[in-house]
Amino acid sequence: MHLINILCLIIPILLAVAFLTLLERKILGYMQLRKGPNIVGPYGLLQPIADAIKLFIKEPLRPATSSKLMFTLAPTLALTLALSLWIPIPMPYPLVNLNLGVLFILAMSSLAVYSILWSGWASNSKYALIGALRAVAQTISYEVTLAIILLSIMMTNGSFTLSNLTTTQEHMWLILPLWPLAMMWFISTLAETNRAPFDLTEGESELVSGFNVEYAAGPFALFFLAEYANIIMMNALTAILFFGALHNPMFPELHTLNLITKTLILTMTFLWVRASYPRFRYDQLMHLLWKSFLPLTLALCMFHVSAPATFAGVPPHM
C-alpha cells in the first residue's frame, strides 16, 4: 500500500474534524439565538485554523507528579485509533477491504478505552481519574449493545464485510425492517462517543473537564481531534449500516457524495441533540443500558437468528 493512499484518507478526515468544530459552534450559537464565531475570516471560516495554530504553539504543560510516558502516549494512542477505525469503511471502496471489517471496528473502538484510562491515571489528579473511570464504564457498557446490534445486522447482511451492505440495501434501506435496532444504535453511538446527553465524563459542575483536565495545548488538541473523528466515523458507519447508498461502478463518486450527505445529516442530529437535551444522571445512564437496551437487543438478536430457519429463508450472500 502506498503512503499516498493513507494520506488521502487521513487529511480529509482531519479537515472534516476541523470544520465540524466550527459547524458545532455555529449551530449551538444559532440555537441559543446568537451568531457563533464570525470574526476570523469570512463568516468565521478560518476559526478552526486559528484554534489549531493557537493550540499547537502553546507550551504543553505536564503535572510534576504525572507519569511522563503514559501522559504523552495516551493522546497519541487516542488519535491513532480514531484514524485507524476508518480503514474498513467503504466510501465506496475501503482502504483495506477486510473480511471481518465489523469486528475490526469493534476491536479498535474497545482499545480506545485504554487511552482514556491511561490519561486519567497518568494525570495523577482525582478529577481526571474519576472522569476516566466514568468514561471507561460508559464506553464498555454501551459497546455490549453495539456488538449485539451489529450481530443482528450481520445476520441480515449474511457477511461481516461492510462492502456487502451496499448490495444488501439495493432495494430497501435496513432502517425500515430494523428500525428498533436503528433507534437503539443511534442512542448507543451518542453514549459511545461521550456526547450530550451522555457526556458525563465532562461534567463541568463535578469534574471540571473530566479525564483531560490536566492536558493543555497539543496533547489536548489530539484528544479533541480523536473525539470528533470518532463522531464522524460513527455517523458514517450508521449511514452505511442503515441508509445504504446505491453504488454504480460507472460513477463511484455518486456513492461517496450520497454517503457524505447522510453522514453530515446524522452529525447535525448529534449537534441538535446536544443543543436540546440536558445531561443524564449516571445511574439513569446505566439503567437505560442494562435494564432497557440489553434485554431488547438480545431478544431482537434471537429473533434474527431464528427468523431464517423459521421462515425457511436464507440471508442474502454475495
From Swiss-Prot:
Signal peptide: none annotated. Keywords: Electron transport, Membrane, Mitochondrion, Mitochondrion inner membrane, NAD, Respiratory chain, Translocase, Transmembrane, Transmembrane helix, Transport, Ubiquinone. Its main location: mitochondrion. Its EC number is 7.1.1.2. GO terms for cellular component: mitochondrial inner membrane. It is found in: Mitochondrion inner membrane. It is a multi-pass membrane protein. It catalyses: a ubiquinone + NADH + 5 H(+)(in) = a ubiquinol + NAD(+) + 4 H(+)(out). It comes from the Eukaryota. The chain crosses the membrane at residues 3-23, 37-57, 69-89, 100-120, 135-155, 171-191, 223-243, 253-273, 293-313. GO terms for molecular function: NADH dehydrogenase (ubiquinone) activity. GO terms for biological process: aerobic respiration. InterPro entries: NADH_UbQ_OxRdtase_su1/FPO (IPR001694), NADH_UbQ_OxRdtase_su1_CS (IPR018086). Pfam families: NADHdh. PANTHER family: NADH DEHYDROGENASE SUBUNIT 1, NADH-UBIQUINONE OXIDOREDUCTASE CHAIN 1. Belongs to the complex I subunit 1 family. Core subunit of the mitochondrial membrane respiratory chain NADH dehydrogenase (Complex I) that is believed to belong to the minimal assembly required for catalysis. Complex I functions in the transfer of electrons from NADH to the respiratory chain. The immediate electron acceptor for the enzyme is believed to be ubiquinone. This is NADH-ubiquinone oxidoreductase chain 1. It comes from Dasypus kappleri (Great long-nosed armadillo). The gene is MT-ND1.
